[in-house]
Every structure is written in C-alpha cells, then in structure tokens.
Amino acid sequence: METVENLAMLPLHDATLVRLTVEWQEGVCTADILGALRPGASMARLRWTGVTSIDIPHGAPWGPSAQILEGRGPLRNGRWEMTMQSGDMIAVCATACAMELDPRGGGGR
C-alpha cells in the first residue's frame, strides 16, 4: 500500500467506482476503482483508516454515472472527497488514505 498524500493528484477522472465498503468495527472504508491509475494497472483500491464519518449520497442530480469526476483531500478535519460525474459527492473523514494497485492480483474484473 502506498500512502496517498493528495487525492487530487491521482488520475481519478473517468475511472469507475465499482464498490465502496465499510468495515465498521475496524473503522476502515475501501473504494475499488476500475481505470488505470498507474500504467499497467486496471484496478486499484483506496483504503481509508481511522474513519469517523462517511457520507454517500446517491441522488444523481446530473444523471446516473459510476465514473469519478475528481478527488480532493485531505481537507480540514481529515475529510477526503470524491465527486462523481453523477453530481454526488462522497465524503470520508479519516486519519489516513492509502492506495493499492491491482488488489486482486492484476487486471481487475
């Protein structure tokens, strides 16, 4: 796992959010993302630890989409944001974020 210092620096635009999971007891949230974040990698996983809150709206004010528009964070109070091309903003408040490429062993789904 590689520490993410600035979510905005990752090439998330047009990547697909496949799955978002929460491990409540551990305070962990993971996002499985399809789309080359690095050359040769098709699937990546963002993993937030020390999670204190999560906001996952799914109203799609701009229309349905599973693609990411942009990422931001960490902002104040450890807030990390992913704006979806649907117009929804997913927000995770956490102490840290890390990225793992090809978490399922290369190639995604």
Regions found by a protein language model. Give the residues of each.
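Surface-exposed, interaction-prone regions used to assemble/regulate multi-protein complexes
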Residues: 1-109
